[in-house]
Curated annotation (Swiss-Prot):
Disulfide bonds join 31-55, 41-64. The keyword Disulfide bond applies. One of its GO terms (cellular component) is extracellular region. The lineage of its organism: Eukaryota, Viridiplantae, Streptophyta, Embryophyta, Tracheophyta. Belongs to the DEFL family. It comes from Arabidopsis thaliana (Mouse-ear cress). GO terms for biological process: defense response to fungus; killing of cells of another organism. This is Putative defensin-like protein 52.
């Protein structure tokens, strides 16, 4: 009986982080060269709890993207120029 109670206590004290996500997290603002660039992406993504941030311009869009090392969440924001 004591062994059973120890097992129940060990299981109930475990720390599980469960997150239900309906889609990828949204960045705070649109990433656009000359307006919202690397510094702003880093600031907003890190403020939201992500590990890193980047701003990658493209021919018709720019993306603010980050991936956390622990949960592999991706945060993208696209801006049409």
């Amino acid at each position: 009986m004591t062994f059973f109670l120890v097992i129940i206590l060990a299981i109930s004290s475990s720390n599980y982080n469960v997150l239900a996500v309906s889609g990828p997290p949204k960045c705070i603002a649109l990433c656009r060269p000359g307006y919202y660039e690397r510094f702003e992406c880093f600031h907003d993504c890190i403020t939201e709890g992500y590990d890193d941030g980047s701003c990658v311009p493209g021919p018709t869009t720019a993306k603010c993207g980050i991936i956390t090392k622990t949960t592999n969440k991706i945060c993208y924001s696209f801006a049409f120029e």
